[in-house]
């Protein structure tokens, strides 16, 4: 007997459940299960040996502590690819062979993990020289079977073996061993490579009782995450939610005051109506002239009426806004006695004004925002009858509208339509 090759083994793995294979390697076999493997690697000495016999046979042994045979395979030298096959991927060599030790043909598996590339290459060259079938293991198999990295446990762990000496053709010794370092790990094909290149491969460890597990920390890579939504605490993300304004109750006496406080103006229709209108026309008009501070149309009245106006200004309820005051061209006593005479007079004045507006160019009525007249004024002659100059620029006094006038205006459909439009405009402004 001649020892052809002998290498040291770092780890030995054995599949505990043989597969029934009546047709040899061509039989339909279930894939091996990871939890059916047993491993031995610590507190012992393991060797893989290839021996040549004088009878032309080959012996393959896996020896524990130079005395116990864990694998004892006897094969004819030469064409034996139907009896044994090897798969290799540095630093692991896997073997499967057909055994008839217990009668039916069974397929058994084992695998060895060599300590370095030198021992791995020595074993591969020896097997190739003896015409054994060696196949390169697929990478996908290694990735599916390697689930953990196992380190040697401390001294003091006991390993019990039942040594057996029964040998037969194509069979191994009936050796059983128990150890506390048996875990659910089949292949360590990438174990050594992971140790040499820790940065290229990360080892995944499974928790197991009574075993020191090799733990490898993952690198804490800081990722710059760009958030698609802004933080609600940042000033750019916080939005001021305006509360809904209270409903505005617009009364006929407050319409002109509300218009003066807003900066929104409706388009002018001066092409159809003259901008200088009488008192009744100003109340019933449906549009407001564009706003421009500093200019306003002034109606000139006699001095007697100016004095009456100044007295009435002190008792009105309108404040600090330039508004158009409603005045009749007839005497107040006549208006109080007969409202029909007032309407007739208003109609005459409106007709005369329309006739004058045909030949006069359109003029813009401009309302100052600050509530004062800046000295610029336009003079309007109403039918050539009355011309009054109002020189008081500041109208800060309050004004009063009589109940009778309010009742009359509430009955006026055109005036009420205009009030409704003003209310609609104001509501839209507050909604914005």
Curated annotation (Swiss-Prot):
Tell me the compartments it is located in: Chromosome
Any GO CC annotation of this UniProt entry: chromosome
- Gene Ontology annotations of biological process type: reciprocal meiotic recombination
Compositional bias (Basic and acidic residues) spans? 343-354
Q: Where is this region: Disordered?
A: 333-373
Query: What keywords appear on the UniProt entry?
Result: Chromosome, Meiosis
Concerning its family, UniProt says: Belongs to the REC114 family.
Q: What does this protein do?
A: Required for meiotic recombination events; not required for mitosis.
Name under which the protein is recorded: Meiotic recombination protein REC114
Natural source organism: Saccharomyces paradoxus
């Amino acid at each position: 007997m001649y020892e052809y090759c002998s290498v040291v083994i770092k780890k030995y793995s054995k599949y505990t459940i043989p597969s029934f294979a009546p047709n040899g390697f061509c039989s339909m076999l279930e894939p091996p299960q990871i939890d059916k493997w047993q491993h031995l690697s610590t507190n012992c000495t393991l060797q893989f040996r290839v021996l040549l016999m004088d009878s032309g046979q080959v012996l393959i042994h896996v020896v524990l502590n130079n005395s116990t045979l864990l694998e004892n395979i006897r094969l004819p030298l030469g064409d034996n690819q139907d009896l044994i096959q090897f798969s290799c991927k540095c630093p692991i060599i896997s073997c499967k062979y057909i055994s008839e030790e217990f009668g039916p043909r069974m397929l058994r598996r084992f695998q060895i993990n060599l300590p370095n590339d030198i021992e791995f290459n020595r074993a591969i060259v020896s097997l190739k020289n003896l015409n054994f079938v060696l196949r390169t293991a697929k990478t996908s198999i290694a990735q599916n079977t390697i689930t953990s990295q196992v380190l040697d446990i401390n001294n003091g762990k006991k390993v019990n073996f039942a040594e057996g000496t029964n040998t037969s053709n194509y069979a191994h010794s009936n050796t059983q061993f128990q150890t506390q370092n048996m875990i659910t790990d089949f292949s360590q094909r990438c174990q050594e490579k992971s140790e040499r290149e820790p940065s290229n491969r990360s080892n995944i460890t499974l928790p197991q009782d009574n075993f020191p597990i090799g733990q490898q920390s993952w690198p804490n890579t800081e990722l710059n995450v760009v958030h698609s939504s802004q933080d609600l605490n940042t000033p750019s993300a916080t939005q001021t939610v305006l509360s809904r304004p209270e409903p505005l109750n617009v009364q006929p006496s407050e319409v002109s005051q509300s218009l003066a406080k807003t900066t929104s103006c409706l388009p002018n229709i001066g092409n159809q109506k003259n901008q200088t209108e009488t008192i009744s026309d100003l109340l019933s008009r449906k549009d407001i002239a564009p706003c421009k501070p500093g200019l306003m149309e002034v109606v000139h009245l006699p001095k007697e009426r100016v004095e009456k106006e100044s007295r009435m200004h002190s008792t009105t309820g309108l404040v600090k806004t330039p508004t158009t005051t409603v005045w009749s061209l007839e005497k107040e006593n006549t208006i109080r006695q007969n409202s029909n005479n007032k309407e007739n007079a208003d109609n005459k004045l409106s007709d005369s004004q329309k006739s004058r507006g045909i030949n006069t160019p359109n003029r813009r009525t401009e309302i100052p925002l600050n509530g004062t007249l800046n000295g610029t004024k336009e003079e309007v002659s109403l039918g050539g009858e009355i011309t009054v100059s109002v020189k008081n620029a500041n109208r800060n006094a309050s004004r009063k509208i009589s109940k009778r006038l309010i009742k009359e205006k509430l009955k006026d459909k055109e005036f009420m339509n205009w009030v409704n439009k003003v209310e609609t405009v104001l509501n839209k402004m507050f909604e914005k």
